[in-house]
Amino acid sequence: MQLDLPQHCMSCLVLIITYMNESGSKSSGVELTQDNLTAKQLDYAVFLPAISGFYATFVGKQRNEPYVDPARFPQGLTDMEQLNWLNSTKALFPYRWSLASGGHANLDLSKQDWSEDMVRNREPGTFILGDSGGFQIAKGLWEGDWRANSGCAKAQKKRELVLNWLDNVSDYCMTLDIPTWVIHDKKAAKACGISTLPAAVAATKFNNEYFMKHRKGVRNGGTKILNVLQGDNHGSADQWYETMKEYCDPAKYPDTHFDGWAMGGQNMCDVDLVLRRLVALRYDNLLQEGVHDWMHFLGTSKLEWAVLLTVIQRAVRKYVNPAFTISFDCASPFLATANGQVYYENVFKHDSKWSYRMGPSADDKKYATDTRKWSTGVVADGIYNNWQESPISDMLTMKDICIYKAGTPKTGVVLTEENFRDPALYDVLPDVNKNGKWGKTSWDSFSYALLMGHNVWMHLTAVQEANQRFDAGERPAMMQRSTGDYAKFEDIVEAIFAAPDRQTAEDIIKLYDTYWMEIVGTRGFKGKKTKNARSQFHVLYTFDEPEVDTEPEDQLQSEALQLLESEQIK
């Protein structure tokens, strides 16, 4: 069977799976076309899709039962595992790295939970970075008094459960840190009992010491632990580092020291601070090969940062630690879908802004019988000007997503926002969802899952294509200084790490102080005030705060995904 491959699959791997009948003769042949993103990763900084529990439920539960009736699958999808990028043999786009959050997981590993199986029973050789749930503490979602030495039984039980989960599920994980933005949020501070920077530092130290004392240990098959660095400005970030760095020191803790670093707060969105911190780590002997081989940047969604972090990773490998890897994550592919947004193209304009573009998608019950190919329909009907095909969207028709049919109202009835749910107004009732309800949307829960998978592929390929283009000589505007010597970012980073001593390296960083102000960080920060301004990702900034450059993914509301998950039938 010969397939006509779309443009993006020209470099795909094709596996031939031959099914034999009982007599041994060939009964049929199926070609599984895989876009092997693991093979395309090369030496780039590693993007980790932050797996949504909503999405993982489809993969996991289908292993035990027909959670989705196979008759609901679009033509070409024969196995839910095709949507599981952690499955190297069956996935449409194998990719072996991901992030899973303990904050959203069922932490009780003593009982089978098929909705968790995508992560719990993943293929050997795949990589999971476990997030510990500090965000849930700060938001008050994990109830309890989280202050150091509070004696709170609820908080202690959660510490025990999350460490056990991380030790048994992840390859690397984050410490149970308290994000410093909590001290600027009165509601959050009240929920967790932490309202000052010293209290956040003390609570994190308490959690660090618990993790250090009770971790399984790498030699015993346990997870490696990343020391999370917080701070909402340069001063507090420096204070946090000086306080917490000892936990990664093998001289002080030869058997239980932490195994790398995670950049949170201002550390993960401020290039000046990132470079200064790496120089400090180098000269504090805390980037040792085989000891501190991993650094993760939390919640990093800017496409240009995929290239920026690759440049930094390569410099550290060249001059400090050949085994060093930088990873970064975001949940944008899942959040976007929950907000009705779908990635439709990635944009790479030399010496300009690089970005993934997302927009409101087709959601109309008139499409419930529309057999047009999805990409054809959304462009023809003006929903998108362009559509970049993914291995998932390539299978879809309009009716595969817009699954619910509209009802037929009685003659003379005008449906409104107030009355459209009244069954007495219909001759033929609208389709109902799994919960026996009907609403305005034409999507069922599997529609969301399919488009989430598409969005993940779009995000992953955007990151890889950005690095490929950069290596070929193209660059986003922020990777070159716009004034003065017009220095390229990679040349400056090379000079910093090639410097003969710490002072020289720090002087080079200081020399380019105005350039660092040009680089837009995660959550849109840009400008000199980032050195002192607070960093809270849950607020919408005004220009009274640091200048910002926001993108669609900055405005996605996490509540939409939480609502979707809460309505999901487990």
Q: What residue spans do the PLM features occupy?
A:
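Glycine-rich phosphate/ribose-binding loops and adjacent secondary-structure elements
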Residues: 14-30, 220-407, 412
